């Protein structure tokens, strides 16, 4: 007997991105028009994929409040789309980085130079008193820390960016059968969807709730009952180590229980780095 199975599609979007910049190449506005293919019906978080992407189109760039995003989601005869490896971030990152390359060509700037002019600066993560207050982006989310220019400079040094540019100029002559391309990208990852007011404001699963119970048994052993069910993440080891450290006992004295609704009836999901 032959069994066949299928799963979700991870990507299904048509994106139109427009950038505005001043004469020095600094971004002043971003407009995104998105058509999202939902597939034949909604899966777990099908509409959430373009919604998460909406927070990520600015990338790691210091974008002012001029951000215009609109998404139209449509049902089609295709397999449903849903969260798979990034859930909105790969689509948004691809779009903004391709748009940055196009802007660099239009302004006759090196693509890396354009990015350097627009990175969120390290000092923007600190308040006037020198406290690390984080950077609040145009959409209201707060990024706690970052030094994007330093990270990029280190990457470019290791990649010998200037040397590769010279090789590109030599190799990409008219009529060449092989041409050398250079790509660069950086991004924020929106993951770890823990209980939060942000998720609640999006009407997402009661704010991304989760449950856990710790019991000290008469035998002096400890039980940790978790609503997240592991499938390769190593929850049993990690939860036992965390509980043991906090309670001052050996991890061998901690039992982690999961995946049984008779024991742990309350649990949302294990995905998107929201457990480990």
For every predicted segment, state its role.
Residues 8-10, 21-54, 97, 106-153:
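Molybdopterin (Moco) oxidoreductase catalytic core of the xanthine/aldehyde oxidoreductase family
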